[in-house]
């Protein structure tokens, strides 16, 4: 029991101490905030007092100045000296708008040229302060400069539109450029498909040499060619010479014919050609024609050339195949 009671007292004491600390912190912060709140009010109040004091001083000086101008009829030199006295007063610019009516003081030097009317230009300065009703005379010189300004103002206004019209008149005859008619592009005509073609290959000897006739004859016969019409060789559908001719072989030298007894015969090369369309599948016939040309070139030691007698390339072979397809589509 004693231990529990002691523990309770310790807890209660700790809570009380914390509460006192919190209360003290809160009161000190509250007093500090109240001090900061009072400072701006005091500053504003002191500033207003100073401003009101300055206004009273200025009003007193203005009243005294009016009394001096009424009583004193001194010469023009003395009056000019007195009229120059307010200038240091206007060097100070108070923060309030109540001192703005004293700005017209700059106008009196213009009206002080005649000596008799010297005191009058100083009076309009004091009219907005004390006696605007008792001195109507300064109002007349103010109205006189206003009337010429109003009359002179419309003159540039009426003359302004004239140059504008003159500048606008030369622009009237200018006609807007008309868009030129755009020529429509001519319709692109599709290239007419060819309905027939001739595929040509050449088997030629190397540069500066010729093919042997006996060796050439044996290679031609091994490739399935048979001597026939027009004294040239033909490759038929069947190797024994039966069936329609698929492609033919002629001499590269004019007139292009051969002699079956050409043991002592030599030539720079031979030409293999195929007419499209032909019997059967033209693409298969083209492959057989290419194989025959390669076989003859290998046997005689020559090379395969295209229709321009240039080295045969894969691009040229694809071109031949495209021509064959085009002819087939045109005749389909």
Swiss-Prot record:
It comes from the Bacteria. The keyword Membrane applies. One of its GO terms (cellular component) is cell division site. InterPro entries: Cell_div_ZipA (IPR011919), ZipA_FtsZ-bd_C (IPR007449), ZipA_FtsZ-bd_C_sf (IPR036765). Gene3D superfamilies: ZipA, C-terminal FtsZ-binding domain. GO terms for biological process: division septum assembly; FtsZ-dependent cytokinesis. Residues 42-190 are annotated as: Disordered. Residues 51-63 have a biased composition (Acidic residues). SMART domains: ZipA_C. CDD domains: ZipA. The keyword Transferase does not apply. Residues 28-332 are cytoplasmic. Keywords: Cell cycle, Cell division, Cell inner membrane, Cell membrane, Membrane, Transmembrane, Transmembrane helix. Interacts with FtsZ via their C-terminal domains. Essential cell division protein that stabilizes the FtsZ protofilaments by cross-linking them and that serves as a cytoplasmic membrane anchor for the Z ring. Also required for the recruitment to the septal ring of downstream cell division proteins. This is Cell division protein ZipA. It comes from Escherichia coli O1:K1 / APEC.
């Amino acid at each position: 029991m004693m231990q529990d009671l002691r523990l309770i007292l310790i807890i209660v004491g700790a809570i009380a101490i914390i509460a006192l600390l919190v209360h003290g912190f809160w009161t000190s912060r509250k007093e500090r905030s109240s001090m900061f709140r009072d400072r701006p009010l005091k500053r504003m109040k002191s500033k207003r007092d100073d401003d009101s004091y300055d206004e009273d001083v200025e009003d007193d000086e203005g009243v005294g100045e009016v009394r001096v101008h009424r009583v004193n009829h001194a010469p023009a030199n003395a009056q000019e000296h007195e009229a120059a006295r307010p200038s240091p007063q206007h060097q100070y610019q108070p923060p309030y708008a109540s001192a703005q009516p004293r700005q017209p003081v700059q106008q009196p030097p213009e009206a002080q040229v005649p000596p008799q009317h010297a005191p009058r230009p100083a009076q309009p300065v004091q009219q907005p302060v004390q006696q605007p009703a008792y001195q109507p005379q300064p109002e007349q010189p103010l109205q006189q400069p206003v009337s010429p300004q109003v009359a002179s103002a419309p003159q540039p206004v009426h003359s302004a539109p004239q140059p504008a019209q003159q500048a606008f008149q030369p622009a009237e005859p200018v006609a807007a450029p008309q868009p030129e008619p755009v020529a429509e592009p001519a319709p692109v005509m599709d290239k007419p498909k060819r309905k027939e073609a001739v595929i040509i290959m050449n088997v030629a000897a190397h540069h500066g040499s010729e093919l042997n006739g006996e060796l050439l004859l044996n290679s031609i016969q091994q490739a399935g060619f048979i001597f026939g019409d027009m004294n040239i060789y033909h490759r038929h559908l069947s190797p024994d010479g039966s069936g329609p001719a698929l492609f033919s072989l002629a001499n590269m030298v004019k007139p292009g014919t051969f002699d079956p007894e050409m043991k002592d015969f030599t030539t720079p090369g031979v030409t293999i050609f195929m007419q499209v369309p032909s019997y059967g599948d033209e693409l298969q016939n083209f492959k057989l024609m290419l194989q025959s040309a390669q076989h003859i070139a290998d046997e005689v030691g020559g090379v395969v050339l295209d229709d321009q007698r240039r080295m045969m390339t894969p691009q040229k072979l694809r071109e031949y195949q495209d021509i064959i397809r085009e002819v087939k589509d045109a005749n389909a």
